[in-house]
Amino acid sequence: MYAIELFMKNQQAQPEPVRYPATTLFRDKDGKVLEWEITSITSAENDEIRMACSKARSGMTKKELENSFDVSLYNAKLAAACTTEPNLRNVKLQDSYGVKCAEDLLRKMLPLPGEYDRYVQKVQETCGFGEQFAQDVETVKN
């Protein structure tokens, strides 16, 4: 058995940010592809995003609530919340793309569907969601 002290908050390691080349469309002055930084969010933050993506109405059953979950919106909000570089909440950056929110900016900065999908998948991996999560998302979509 482990000593309970090993589980105390001050012993808890913080997840390391992940660097990821989300797209080849942005390069530095030497032509090197810029890497984006992804940082995991907390379970509480994830719950807030999930709630924002569910359209609950009074009288809905649990099954109806599950069916009202907007997976696409969830993926966009999760990816935007976990992206720490570039800063998707930067007003100047948003203005340059003509958008007003981080989720829309992310879609504009990753205009190729494959790049966007791979980025969302990398964000999910960074947050600890494995293959089962991806399968669950597909099940909800269908």
Question: What is each of the regions a protein language model found here?
Answer:
Residues M1, L25-F26, D30:
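Low-complexity, charged, repeat-rich alpha-helical/coil interaction segments
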Residues M1-P15, Q132-N142:
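Low-complexity intrinsically disordered segments
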Residues Q11-F26:
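Short acidic, Pro/Gly- and aromatic-enriched capping/linker segments at domain boundaries
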